[in-house]
Amino acid sequence: MLTNSRDIIRRLERDGFVLKSVRGSHHKFVHVATKRMAVVVHPKRDIPIGTVHGIYKDAGWERD
């Protein structure tokens, strides 16, 4: 499971998410087809595991 914000952002973009807005350290990504939204705190090397689980759920990913 990815815990680094850069790696999570790369995977979001690879899976069809685009950056919609940034407010402070919160980057909002929206999927172009499904309109799912995921918010990633960036830059942060080690995101808490509970937050990572929430990002995975918002993105529609299965846990690794």
State each model region's role.
Residues 1-22, 26-64:
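Basic nucleic-acid-binding interfaces
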